[in-house]
Amino acid sequence: LKKKEAKEKITQLLETVNLTDAAHKKLGAFSGGMKQRALIAQALLNEPKILILDEPTAGLDPKERIKIRNFISEIAEDKIVLISTHVVSDIEFIAKEIILLKRGKLVSHDTCQNLVNEIANKVVEMEIEKEELKYFQDNYRVSNLYHNDDKIVVRLVTDNPPENHKITIANPTLEDLYLYIFEQGM
C-alpha cells in the first residue's frame, strides 16, 4: 500500500473495530479485547482474498463481539474467511459452511442447518427434582438448565433419553451439536 492509501485504510479500519480513540496509544497499553480488534484490523490492511482468524471475538464484551461478528460477515462477501473458534454463536451467525474437526480429523462439513438437523430428536427437555441434578450432570450431556418453581428443567443432548421422565423433544442448536460431537462418552 502507498503511504496515503495506508493512512486512509488504517483510519477506516480503526473506526470499524472501534479503536479510533486509541489510535495513538501503544499496543502494550491495550486491553485484551482491544488487542484482538487491532489484530483483526491489521490482518485486513492489505485486503487479503483469504483471511484466517483464530478466536476473533475472544475477550470481547458482548457489544464488541456483535460488532466484530457483523463486520466479519460483511467482509466475507468478497473473500474467504476461515474461523477457528469455540464461540459457537460466532459460527452460527457468520458461517455459510461449517467444518468440524476432532483431534485433527474431519468429523463433518455442511451448512449450519444441515449439521444441526443431524441431531434432530436427540435433544430433549424435562423437569427433574433438585436432588436428581447431579445424576443427570454426571450421566448426560446437559446443555442447559433453569429453575422452575421447586423443579429444575434440564436440556439433554442424548441418544438415550431417560425413560422414567416426561420428555419434550427440543429443537437442536449448534451448541447442542457441539456437545454431541465433542462430549461423546459422557
Which positions does each model-derived feature cover?
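Conserved ABC ATPase signature
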Residues: K26-F30
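Short loop immediately C-terminal to the Walker-B catalytic DE motif
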Residues: T57-A58, V88
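Catalytic Walker B motif of ABC-type/P-loop ATPase nucleotide-binding domains
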Residues: L51-D54
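ABC transporter nucleotide-binding domain
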Residues: N70-L156
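Conserved ABC ATPase "signature" region
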Residues: K4-A22
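Hydrophobic anchor residue at the start of the ABC signature
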Residues: I40
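Conserved catalytic motifs of ABC-family nucleotide-binding domains
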Residues: E47
